Amino acid sequence: MYIKQVIIQGFRSYRDQTIVDPFSSKHNVIVGRNGSGKSNFFYAIQFVLSDEFSHLRPEQRLALLHEGTGPRVISAFVEIIFDNSDNRLPIDKEEVSLRRVIGAKKDQYFLDKKMVTKNDVMNLLESAGFSRSNPYYIVKQGKINQMATAPDSQRLKLLREVAGTRVYDERKEESISLMKETEGKRDKINELLKYIEERLHTLEEEKEELAQYQKWDKMRRALEYTIYNQELNETRAKLDELSSKRETSGEKSRQLRDAQQDARDKMEEIERQVRELKSKISAMKEEKEQLSSERQEQIKQRTKLELKTKDLQDELAGNSEQRKRLLKERQKLLEKIEEKQKELAETEPKFSSVKQKEESGIARLAQATQERTDLYAKQGRGSQFTSKEERDKWIKKELKSLDQAINDKKRQIAAINKDLEETEVNKEKNLEQYTKLDQDLNEVKTRVEELDKKYYEVKNKKDELQSERNYLWREENAEQQSLAAKREDLEKKQQLLRAATGKAILNGIDSINKVLEHFRRKGINQHVINGYHGIVMNNFDCEPAFYTCVEVTAGNRLFYHIVESDEVSTKILMEFNKMNLPGEVTFLPLNKLDVRDTAYPETNDAIPMISKLRYNLRFDKAFKHVFGKTLICRSMEVSTQLARAFTMDCITLEGDQVSHRGALTGGYYDTRKSRLELQKDVRKVEDELHALEAKLNENLRRNIERINNEIDQLMNQMQQIETQQRKFKASRDSILSEMKMLKEKRQQSEKTFMPKQRSLQSLEASLHAMESTRESLKAELGTDLLSQLSLEDQKRVDALNDEIRQLQQENRQLLNERIKLEGTITRVETYLNENLRKRLDQVEQELNELRETEGGTVLTATTSELEAINKRVKDTLARSEGLDITIDKTEVESKDLVKSMDRWKNMEKDHMDAINHDTKELEKMTNRQGMLLKKKEECMKKIRELGSLPQEAFEKYQTLSLKQLFRKLEQCNTELKKYSHVNKKALDQFVNFSEQKEKLIKRQEELDRGHKSIMELMNVLELRKYEAIQLTFKQVSKNFSEVFQKLVPGGKATLVMKKGDVEGSQSQDEGEGSTQSSVPSVDQFTGVGIRVSFTGKQAEMREMQQLSGGQKSLVALALIFAIQKCDPAPFYLFDEIDQALDAQHRKAVSDMIMELASHAQFITTTFRPELLESADKFYGVKFRNKVSHIDVITAEQAKDFVEDDTTHG
């Protein structure tokens, strides 16, 4: 075992967490400048392992925390990790960590991260070989010097610590304390013995007079016994007579009470039947009111449906007439439209011909006019231009403008032509779309009709189910009334049971149920729920005849809770307390009940109570524990005999009980308050209630739930159908709207078609004129410039004038004819579009609407609904009439029961009067019996007060009469008066004091033996202490000589035990002799001296005070090594032990450490190079910014530290 690693944080100069690299198991050297933190590192290890830092005050703990710049350190810890591969520490781990944590208010130890106490740590270290009496496995700075300068007495003290004499001293102190206590007790006993001797002498004189007194007193007591015994016998005879009368009266009272109980039971049964009938009547009346409300509501619905049906029928008849009228009007409109279309067909060709001629004439007129204009312009250009070139230039310019204008005209004509073509194409598409929409409209109308029909079918089915549900609701309400009555009955029974049971017990039962319900709700502790079996009373049954005796036997144990195991009860109680629930609970854990088989007597007068109980054999232990040692007996006499003979509890059927301990209990027991009977009634009502609830849940509520589900499904279907209806109707409206829009587009297109055609003709005529002008200008280009037209041009102008006049005349005629034909066409088209066709559309729409209504779907659905409501009205009326009959019968039955109730009440009253009379008689007998019992008790008390009597006293005066007895008693009392001054307790006191004397003498002897044992123990302890010191001195002395010779070759050193005489005035060497005594005392030792010679010569042996400082240090080191060899530790910590040594001795110390390091670990600090030579691992401590750091370094770096400690500072 050795220190493997040290971790420091916040301790003194080590602020940050410092994890020291693992140490070697042999020799480790730590080097560093003064003040760098080497000693603090040693303090850290000592802080964990040594007793020096055990009891720290808060200010001392704060002093150990790091103080420097930066945040304030509030806690520190030092952790040492041991290599435990040799299992020196009794922990089955190869590495063991020990940490100590301190703060302003805490000081804790952790062993392998588990908190432990300081004592645990110290005991663990002692088990690993760390002795409290030898703390020299850690040698701090200055310890060597302290030992070198210590006096002899200090070294003796050290030797005693190493020898472990502290234990002997502690035992000796305990023995001295015990001896003082024994001396005190011995003195007290001596005082008591002296007092008792004096008192016994006085009592010896009083004994003679006491003998005469006792003679007459014995006679008096015998006479008094005889008198009291005669009175007692007379009283017993009278009591027996009264007891016989009471038994007779009791039997009669039992018969009367049984008859009264029968009457009460009958009354309760009748009362229950009356309550049930009243509840039934109330339910039926309530149902009747509901039926009446339903019937009124149904009649209202029927009236509405009848009116709706009539309206639909009237509407259907009116629609038929309207349809005929509309069809007739439609036919007339079609004929008129056909007539107008025919007229239009005749007029339009004429109009087209006239219009074509007109347009041709207009075009020709424009062409001729333009040609004439061009010729006139040609004539005018002779005066307009001065030369041919100027004219040609102008013509070219005009031609360019004309070309551009002609191109514009052509583009306009092409655009209009394209527009007209698109209009034709759109017209065809419009017609196709219109036809398709018309087909879609018919399909949508068909689908709407189908949905309407389906909707009314689903609605009728839903109404039927609602009617059925109403009936089931009424049935459920009736069952609920019965349930309410049962619950009320159950509550009354439970209230009676609660009144007969303690509140704390009932609260306990309720609290246990809450705990179990909490477990169920959380889904936890299922084994606890399964392991709880309820209270005793709920787990067995028996015949009613045994209720009284069973209940008296069990008492409150009827409410004990049976559980599978103590674990179950513990879990329940933990949650019980956690939830802070009220009540009192007692558990019977089956696994902990120790029940033995009982041998029952074989007799016809008694039976084991447990044989009359019916229960699950799984709970046999619990029932044997409660009832196993009780017999049911025929009578009280039998109970008394068997209880004495078999040491068993016995009880009669009436509840009179005889305990095996002798106690008798009994009296009248009111069976009306029997908790078993009440519990049986509660369970019976609970079973009936559960049956009703099951019937309600399984039949009615299940059917209601099924119908509700079906109604919900139908409602969903209706909603889906309504959604589809809205969807299709919206689609229909959308189609109609689209058809209307297409029709309007077609009409608009037709309106714009003719103006576009006229515009096209005008553009073509204008284009033709422009082209003619362009040709004329082209022909003129390059010709001679003339001021007059040529003959040919003049002729052409004249011809054009004639043609223009003729064309103007023809155009005027064609215009008049066209306007006339156009007016006719416009009038006919307007009549067709604005009148006939619009009206035809209206008629068609009205016919479509009529077709939708004529489908008869609404009327059919309404008729079916009317038939269904009529059936429901009829069924409701029949049910209401049936209820009237049932209510009348039930009320008659209830009245009969009330009359029967009155008869039983009278019977119960008669029985009660008889019981009261019998009770009064019984009360008189009881008072008389009480007086006799009191007299009996007085006689027995007086007999008991007489004390023990001789046998002759029971028979000597039996023949005398009471008069003779009283005369003799008077004579005795007269004689006794003479000895009134006698100490009547003299004899008792004499005996008592004699016994006390014997006890005190025995106690005195015991104390003497104890005193002797203590003295012997103290001598043994003193001897052992002496032997331990002697043995330790020899071992240390031997080791010291050997170590010194190794450190100083050729040198010699010895330890000398110094003694003194008894008075301490003289001393001598150990070798010269010792004080002769039976038990040698260690007090004779005054110190341990040291004599050394560095040359080995006996003549040069010197004392410590004669040595130089370095020699003293070397001798002190030799002593420390000697002590360590005597009591070895697994590792050693030396802080600058070579400080005062010269180089030669430092080398010797280094060699010594190297030798010892093969068996133990050494961690040393030094400023000298000699110790580095024997080291296996090196560590350097640096101090920067007031914080220490420790790291592994090489041997060369360690030597640098030692040779020049400023290099790495």
Swiss-Prot record:
Instruction: State where it is primarily located.
Output: nucleus
Mind telling me how this protein is modified after translation?
Acetylation at Lys-113 and Lys-114 by ESCO1 is important for genome stability and S phase sister chromatid cohesion.
Listed A to Z, the keywords are: Acetylation, ATP-binding, Cell cycle, Cell division, Centromere, Chromosome, Coiled coil, DNA damage, DNA repair, Meiosis, Mitosis, Nucleotide-binding, Nucleus
Tell me the Gene3D superfamilies matching this sequence.
1.10.287.1490, 1.20.1060.20, 3.30.70.1620, P-loop containing nucleotide triphosphate hydrolases (3.40.50.300)
Annotated coiled-coil segments of the chain: 179-350, 393-503, 670-857, 958-989
Q: Which residues bind ATP?
A: G32, R33, N34, G35, S36, G37, K38, S39
A GO molecular function held by the record? double-stranded DNA binding
One cellular component (GO) term of this entry: mitotic cohesin complex
Q: Where is this region: Disordered?
A: 239-269, 281-303, 1061-1082
- Keyword Phosphoprotein assigned to the entry: answer is no
**Residue limits of the SMC hinge domain?**
530-642
Free-text note on domains in this protein's UniProt record:
The flexible SMC hinge domain, which separates the large intramolecular coiled coil regions, allows the heterotypic interaction with the corresponding domain of SMC3, forming a V-shaped heterodimer. The two heads of the heterodimer are then connected by different ends of the cleavable RAD21 protein, forming a ring structure.
Oligomeric state and interaction partners are given as:
Forms a heterodimer with SMC1 in cohesin complex. The cohesin complex is composed of the SMC1 and SMC3 heterodimer attached via their SMC hinge domain, RAD21 which link them, and one STAG protein (STAG1 or STAG2), which interacts with RAD21.
Its biological purpose is as follows: Central component of cohesin, a complex required for chromosome cohesion during the cell cycle. The cohesin complex may form a large proteinaceous ring within which sister chromatids can be trapped. At anaphase, the complex is cleaved and dissociates from chromatin, allowing sister chromatids to segregate. Cohesion is coupled to DNA replication and is involved in DNA repair. The cohesin complex also plays an important role in spindle pole assembly during mitosis and in chromosomes movement.
User: What is stated as this protein's family in its record?
Assistant: Belongs to the SMC family. SMC3 subfamily.
Q: What is this protein called?
A: Structural maintenance of chromosomes protein 3
